Amino acid sequence: MKNFKISTIIPVYNVEKYLEETILSIIKQSIGFENIQMILVNDGSPDNSEEICLKYKEMYPENIIYVKKENGGVSSARNKGLEYATGKYIHFMDSDDRISKNFYKKGLKMLENSNISVVCFRIKMFDAARNYHNMDYRFKGGDKIVDLTKDYQYPLYHMPTALIKKELLNDLKFDIKLKISEDVKFMSEVVVRCKKIGIITSELYYYRKRQDESSAIQSSSRNLSFYFDTPKYSFQYVLDLAKKYPNMKKYLQNAILNDVKWRIFECSFGILNDNQKKEYIELIRDVLLKIDDEVIVAQKHVDNSLIFRELSFKYNKQIGAKLKVNEDSLCFNKTKIFNLNELVLKIYCLDIENNNLNISCCLDCIYNSKYDIYVKSNGKYIKCNKSLHKDGTSNIYDSDFDYLLPFYDISLDLEKYSELEFYIEIENKKYKLNLEFIKFSKINNCKNSCYCENGYVVTHFNNVISIGNKKPLFINIKYMFELFKKKEILPLGLLGLYLLTYPFVRHNNWIISDRYDCAGDSGEHLFKYIKEHDKKKNIYYALKKNSKDYDRMKKIGCILPINSIWYYIKYLNAELVASSHIDGFINNPFGKKSIYLNAFCKRKFVFLQHGVTKDNISGWVGKFNKNVNMFICSSKGEYDSIINIPDYMYDENIVKLTGLPRFDNLFKGNIKEEKLIALMPTWRSSLVGDLILGTQDRKYNYKFKESEYYQFYNGLISNNKLLDILKQYDYKILFCLHPSMKAQLDDFEKSKFVNITFYPNYSDVFKKSKLMITDYSSVFLILHI
């Protein structure tokens, strides 16, 4: 029998598109393939993966073992592969990933020259993402050996990134009950045996983030095993293991915490009923109760607000009122949470209006705060107005208790103040706050960032906001140089174009839009109205250039192709932007880079709406997230709901009861009723793929056809009895799929009696239809017309 240095075990399931790339990355390893044993375990794959396995088995019969078994999940496949492994070291690799050329060479060198049994490698995403793993801090400082009993914040739970000495795995097996996080449990058992691991930065494990989200991890939250089996059989097991190995307790608790924290605030519950949701919440809370506060507080690269929320969830109470000061630190249960001299005040709105400097800010690390914020200027302390609101953050315990973020507002006469510092008062002592400029603030955290308005120039330095009258051109040049040093190429380029074209471009542009790829909503009707009644207005309609409506709208007026350079320049020079939609790229087309351009973008934003708001959507469209300047409503009830729900943070100066511009179109034209039934269900957030960056489109969800939603509606429109009745009475159904689900359109069965569309002319549909059927979409309100 050949003595291999490494046995690579690869479970194979439904990966014919990726498998060859994985195999080749191993064959091409610099240590030579003759030193590698590859074990391909076909876990009942339904595609043509077997042909690829057999092809390479035939090419390398001495190196490759091919095993075929019934589907049992990745754990059973890895266990089966271990039975055949003869190499000195084991590598469990996923069948859609790849490794860098010297991956094994570098790993073997560290393993054989050091007294360790495990090394792990840096992770970089590829395919649908290009970033490093969110815990990349572990790989700062180069290659090293870490003693996990002393430095526990190096969680190792992504199995394919590890190279392990085989003798360490003698009696270990993967838990076949686990479909998700099986490697967390397995790797925890491994590290308590070795206690030291090698960290390798210079070679990479390339983790595929699939475009279609079809990998097990990407689709995990649509699987009940994710909610129940993983907490019960993986998390709880590891925390019990911590009791048996006291010197590894902090490591094991931290490893579980790194998985659990994302579940608390980034989890969808679309597949859970109310009882299941309650059970899941208690499972996660029970996990947190077994993790020491000290470990929660000590997390690396985690915002203080997340730590605060984890503790609140753990103890199921508002801990804001329970905090105590001890030696200039805020403490909970005698555990120091943060140093009061390091508190950060986040300024999310800063602008000038009517010669007043208006500042809105939040202290997002102390929820349910009883503390006041002061502005210090000219030797005096001015108290800010305080209000408590939900911050719009998704979390799994919204129904358990109010979870409120303190917001502060102040308006200052620019003639009276020149320098501003912010302080928090706690137990009769004031602490100076560090400032961070976010979201809609007209100045940002860059050195030389400035905001010029009405002859005033606002700058900041060393946590002091200054108001003066420096020459803006000189400051802007210094600011651009700062952007260059920070390698912020996109905002630098746009700012350069903005300044170059400034003398030649009008600065009173109005930009109107609906969806990025379709017209036909309130934006179009407002655009037409203005073109007819105010021909001097410098107005544009924004639309994707390949839209079916582009040529039609071009005949009405000037069109701005969305995402073109000209669109960005016009947007920066716009006086007003109005849209029936409020997706990020519409009211904030510069995305995360907008903070660098806010000082130059002076536009007001009007939200026209594309329907009637019947639910509380403050977490999505409230001031903290969208900061609109005018919010159009259709009815008194809707208007009152926006005004009276404090979490929107909009008052009567912003919310206006005018009706939607598209409403008038319902009474125009001579369209007659037809024998048409409009079937118009709303969408489900848990059943759609991720948004495609910079669009309103979503990726295809390969699990969609397994949902009750699909099976019900597809069963309805393909029901033979219904189709016979439609034929008998000469009726047709127009199935209007919500635009957010248009990627799934081809999943539904079509017939001569059922037409399926995702973005019809809604006004025409309402006028033509004899009957409209919906579930709980606000479109039902049209029935009252």
Model regions: which residues?
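Nucleotide-sugar donor-binding/catalytic module of glycosyltransferases
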Residues: 1-233, 237, 677, 782
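Nucleotide-activated donor-binding/catalytic signature segment of Leloir-type glycosyltransferases, i.e.
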Residues: 60, 743-759
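Non-catalytic N-terminal targeting/anchoring module and adjacent flexible stem/linker
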Residues: 1-5, 30, 246-247, 251, ...
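Catalytic core of nucleotide-sugar-dependent glycosyltransferases
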Residues: 206-211, 218-246, 268-293
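A donor-sugar binding/catalytic signature common to diverse glycosyltransferases
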Residues: 607, 758-785
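Catalytic binding pocket for nucleotide-activated donors in carbohydrate/polymer assembly enzymes
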Residues: 651-652, 746-751, 778-785
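Conserved catalytic-core segment of nucleotide-activated headgroup transferases in glycan assembly
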Residues: 246-247, 253, 519-531, 661-747
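Active-site and donor-binding regions of nucleotide-sugar-utilizing enzymes
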Residues: 359, 392, 499-501, 507-666
